[in-house]
């Protein structure tokens, strides 16, 4: 009989000593922010040089297994410092919040795209702030959980408090602002233009820039698509050109939040009415990490093979 591990081939588990959490912890440590998490030694060594500008660029979805086949000898791979894992669940909501908060998902509570809240009696899309299934607005709810139980102190706030410098975020125009110094940018060109403009300012600063691609293209077209390949190659070329122009007192750290893998076969719960009969309410969280609310009299009927 096979073990559980043998039944789960090619599963990449998070390593919380070599993960994106440790990457952002190194940046917090550089700015003397108090944190209980371990930093990334390889990045700590690079940051021993005191930089005027620290720039973190997050390319959503551009994991190791996406980048390497597309550009095995490009600018990103040539300057690779270390391979790190994402957090769990390895999804934008959980991973991006790890960068924003400097804490893992099990501390922030930001664990998935769609999370159930008793305050609303329904599942909510965490980044869009809407009801998950009917996409209803939550504006008339008695409590805004994003201002109460789901609120957290951002790395921008922490860095400005401890280091007494300005911390900027560069984000897509649809995103919620997490810094009091937020700049909207929807393309790689706009991201680069804003980084170059900020770096020209002689003050010390931290800049975090986020691109929602290649993730959006990977979801829509797949990991082997021309669309995703073209974006990554173009972004790599333009970021390389930018880095070559930036002054020596500026460091650019480039990372992903998670990777991607094509699915071979998909299943819909809607095709299994007997299974739906067991649920109190629809599943939530992520397709890669689902939660189920099971009717008490149906628990013995279900067997998930665990």
Where are these regions (language model features)?
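Feature captures the catalytic ectodomains and active-site-proximal regions of enzymes
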Residues: 1-306
């Amino acid at each position: 009989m096979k073990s559980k591990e043998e039944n789960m081939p090619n599963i990449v588990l998070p390593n919380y000593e070599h993960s994106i959490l440790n990457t952002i912890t190194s940046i917090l440590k550089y700015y003397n922010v108090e944190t209980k998490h371990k930093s990334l030694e390889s990045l700590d060594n690079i940051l021993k040089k005191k930089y005027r500008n620290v720039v973190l660029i997050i390319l959503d979805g551009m994991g190791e297994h996406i980048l390497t086949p597309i550009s095995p000898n490009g600018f990103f791979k040539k300057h690779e410092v270390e391979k790190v894992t994402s957090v769990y669940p390895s999804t934008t909501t959980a991973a991006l919040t790890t960068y924003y908060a400097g804490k893992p998902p099990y501390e922030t509570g930001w664990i998935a795209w769609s999370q159930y809240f008793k305050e609303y009696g329904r599942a909510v899309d965490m980044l869009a702030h809407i009801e998950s299934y009917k996409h209803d607005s939550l504006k008339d709810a008695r409590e805004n959980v994003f201002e109460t139980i789901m609120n957290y102190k951002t790395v921008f706030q922490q860095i400005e408090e401890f280091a007494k410098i300005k911390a900027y975020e560069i984000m897509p125009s649809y995103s919620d602002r997490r810094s009091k110094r937020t700049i909207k940018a929807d393309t790689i060109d706009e991201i680069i233009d804003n980084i170059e403009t900020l770096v020209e300012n002689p003050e010390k600063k931290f800049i975090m820039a986020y691109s929602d691609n290649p993730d959006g293209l990977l979801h829509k077209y797949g990991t082997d698509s021309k669309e995703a390949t073209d974006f990554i190659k173009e972004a790599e070329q333009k970021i390389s050109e930018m880095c070559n122009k930036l002054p020596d007192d500026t460091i650019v750290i480039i990372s992903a939040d998670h990777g991607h893998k094509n699915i071979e076969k998909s299943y819909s719960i809607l095709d299994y009415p007997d299974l739906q009969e067991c649920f109190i309410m629809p599943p939530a969280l992520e397709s890669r990490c689902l939660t189920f609310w099971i009717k008490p009299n149906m628990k013995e009927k279900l067997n998930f093979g665990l």
